[in-house]
Amino acid sequence: MAHSKSAEQIKKLVLERNGFKSFNPMQELALQKDWQNSSMVVSAPTASGKTIIAELCTLNCIFNKRKKVLYTSPLKALASEHYKDWKKKYSDLGIRIAISTGDFDSSSHYLSNYDLIFTTNEKLDSLITHRAGWLSNVGLLIVDEIHELSSSRGATLEAVVVKMRYILAGLQVLALSATIPNADEIAEWLNAELVVSDYRPVKLMEGIFFNNVIDFGTYAVELEDSDYVEAIVKDTLAKKKQALFFMSTRKNAENLAKKLAPIVSKTLFPKEKLSLQKLSEKVLNVLERPTEQCKLLASLVEKGVAFHHAGLLAKQRELIEEAFRESKLKVLTATPTLAAGVNLPAFRVVIPSLYRYTEDGMQRIPVREYKQMAGRAGRPKYDSTGEAIIVARSEPEKEELWDSYVEGIPEDISSALAYWPVLRMQTLAAIASHFIFDYTSLEEFFSKTFYCKQYGRLSSLIERIHE
């Protein structure tokens, strides 16, 4: 591998590889910190360019510290996207890049030959449990979507961060987060410098659709069709733009795609139809014997529409994402997993319902989740603004949604260890992986958690575990 590089050389390299002339205001804020050595928490809107900070820190760690970098994400799709992006930009520099997201029963010894490893939180937890020897040579841990600490899988993420800092003194941690009110708490927990920015490359307009009008507060868009979905899509296509619909279930995403296909199909040019026909064949032939879902997806793709959810085959997902980025597909109907980081912006993001099925029945989604979905509106380089649209069913609901969501502030991130079943499971996991072996080590381990930072009630936590 090449010799060490100065900060200026690394900055120049990152700008070149991304085709930028300069860093944006959020990135400049981060560069004012000690990004080469200190841990850092970056809290900024979706699509503000946080991954550029990750690229700078990664190159510095590999070239100057001669240590490995671990990049952990909440989703396989996200890890895969980052992996492909890095391979494309940097593999010619002699950086050995790997991805490891499956097979939880292995220490994945082969990874000792790589400099940069993309993984998921669950896989990283497994690598730590199996005491992969090469972990001792990690100099930088990048935690993508650290706001996921509050989610149902947040306890695993918290445990992974605690364990990595436990076994590696002086580990540099770079935590990337959507906009959250208590980013300072996470920074204190990680003993990290804090970068907070509201910068977005494309101006975001948030509005509410009701009674054939999209109200954006400062202006309104009147639509003609009585069916709101059709009206929004027709208006978007007339503007030569794309729309992304976030649906609460896979079935809803598929059904909406079926409904919209004939509308979109009518607007396609012969050249576009030919291109989509070829794409449709690729989607269909991913499997030797296509399933019913494969056939449905292929038939929709031919009409310029696709659905996107976790049930798609990896290769199909890749084809769909690429075609949407290239504007071949005009409308995408997706489940909210897509909001969690996969970079697929559209001029318009439409959210027909803010309710989700949970264990306790139908519940409104958190403001934070809405803001993440809305943040996908607007394509840098293509749009000067992006529009995020919520659908209201009545005038009072419209006002309430405006106050709660459009003007709403995302919720604080809180530790998932506050829930007893989760705490119990993580304690047993820490015992199984030999982080806890007596009362003292139990106390020491939990003193390093985000839970302890937030609540400071270590004694009551220990008492609960003892019970």
Enumerate the language-model features and the residues they cover.
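Conserved pre-motif I regulatory segment
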Residues: 2-43
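Walker A/P-loop NTP-binding motif
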Residues: 32-36, 40, 51-66, 162-165
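Conserved SF1/SF2 helicase motif Ia
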Residues: 59-82, 167-170
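Conserved C-terminal RecA-like helicase domain
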Residues: 70-71, 80-83, 87-98, 251-331, ...
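SF2 helicase catalytic motif II
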Residues: 117, 121-125, 130-173
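Conserved interdomain linker/interface between the two RecA-like ATPase lobes of SF2 helicase motors
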Residues: 162, 172-261, 301, 306, ...
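Conserved segment of the helicase C-terminal RecA-like domain
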Residues: 171, 344, 348-358, 363-404
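C-terminal accessory/connector segments of nucleic-acid motor ATPases
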Residues: 315-324, 407-467
